[in-house]
């Protein structure tokens, strides 16, 4: 391994924040991770950089996962099992499965990032999470010096959470995900639980949608609501939808009857962070070069020339506004480096 030095990381994060890595290595094969000298390095594992806030320079080795490949591993009477390399673009992979007649991931169309990063955050949208379709994750464990396969049930998936985050492996670089296997059930049913998707399909006069129809609807809705990172730098949804106790949700609903709320299996209630931010006066508002997007208050955008410190200032201001108005704490989704 022969890493580059003092590498500009601006092109490698979708918020286009400045920062440099002391050492940078693009990884295109799992074997590259077995180099003995990597064990003692301070490491950070980078995917698509779409869930990352750079707060300055990184004084270690940044491993940029770019392992390619996608294939049908096996098929049985109930499902297809498809493997993809960690470096595969997530949206491109989803569309590839659909063109081959393997439905199941269509609601996750157009989410930025890579396949390898998807399980870490347990990405989700429009009524579907990666955990719903994931079979197993394979990754290199730098401590054990071994390639591990972690089954879905051992990944401890939760809302925007997983074993990889709970153990801090996404921060300390202990495990580098190299590939993911998905289980796509043959007994497919369209997932139209979200009103935006159902409305888009109705507008297109599609009563019995295919998986590709769902994907097309999701893409259309996302393109209308969310900024393209290539044009307006952003990291997608910036805050988790907060989950509160039922008694607090009821009190808030009494005061704000239009508050969107979603009962959870454990009896608590999930609230819509975007709605809270908008009602707190932050939709389309900025603090210096960083603000909340005018079409979707949940998305934080870099309006030009922002730094990680600018992002942190705006984040804190939004959190304070929501806390003051609703007594609800917002937690950021991205990783801070």
Swiss-Prot record:
The active site is at residues 160, 237, 333. GO terms for biological process: cell division; cell wall organization; peptidoglycan biosynthetic process; regulation of cell shape. InterPro entries: FAD-bd_PCMH, FAD-bd_PCMH-like_sf, FAD-bd_PCMH_sub1, FAD-bd_PCMH_sub2, MurB, MurB_C, MurB_C_sf, Oxid_FAD_bind_N. The keyword NADP applies. Residues 16-187 form the FAD-binding PCMH-type domain. Pfam families: FAD_binding_4, MurB_C. Pathway: Cell wall biogenesis; peptidoglycan biosynthesis. It is found in: Cytoplasm. Its main location: cytoplasm. Its EC number is 1.3.1.98. It catalyses: UDP-N-acetyl-alpha-D-muramate + NADP(+) = UDP-N-acetyl-3-O-(1-carboxyvinyl)-alpha-D-glucosamine + NADPH + H(+). One of its GO terms (cellular component) is cytosol. The keyword Nucleotide-binding does not apply. One of its GO terms (molecular function) is UDP-N-acetylmuramate dehydrogenase activity. Its cofactor is FAD. Keywords: Cell cycle, Cell division, Cell shape, Cell wall biogenesis/degradation, Cytoplasm, FAD, Flavoprotein, NADP, Oxidoreductase, Peptidoglycan synthesis. Cell wall formation. This is UDP-N-acetylenolpyruvoylglucosamine reductase. It comes from Dechloromonas aromatica (strain RCB). The gene is murB.
